[in-house]
Structure formats: C-alpha cells, structure tokens
Amino acid sequence: MTRRFKSTRKFDKQFKQLDQKTSKQTEKAIELFISDPSHPSLRYKKIQGTDNFYEISVNMSVRIIIEVTSEANDQINTLYIIGTHDDVFPPK
C-alpha cells in the first residue's frame, strides 16, 4: 500500500497564519510523519469517536488533525486542520 499526502484549503490557510517558529515546527512534524508516523514525539493517535481521524502533535500546544482514507491500493493522509488543542478540539 502506498501512502499519499495532501492538505485541505482550510489547513493551508491556517498554516499560513502560523508564526515563523510554529511554521518551522509544523514542517518538521510533517516531514517526520511522512518518514516515520510512529515516532514517539508525534504522539500519533486515533481521535476517539471517529472512524478515520487522527492527530499528531507539532509541539505541546499545536495539533494537526489528519483524515486517513483508502483509495484502491493507496492510503490517503489528508492534513485536515491545524491549531491549538482548544482550536481543534473545542470544549463540549
């Protein structure tokens, strides 16, 4: 199975609004996710109550939500949204 990566327009817009330090940390986290999604620093895990959404950590406060789907023999990893924990997981 081949892993493919893409991003949503919302993710792209949110990424452009990050400060320089967080932007660099995000790029590093994405590169690490592409090469080794199980790396402990990413804290990659499935989001409870969803079928195909996962999260990775950029740093202690910023998260990336990823939608993982399948298409033929490909695993599609869509960078869905990015933001602080409270931004991506609003209080219930």
Regions flagged by a language model, labelled:
Residues 2-4, 58-92:
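Enriched for short, Lys/Arg-rich terminal
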Residues 6, 13, 37-42, 83-84:
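Residue-level signal for pocket-adjacent positions within structured domains
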Residues 14, 29, 46, 78-81:
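Residue-level recognition of specific faces of alpha-helices
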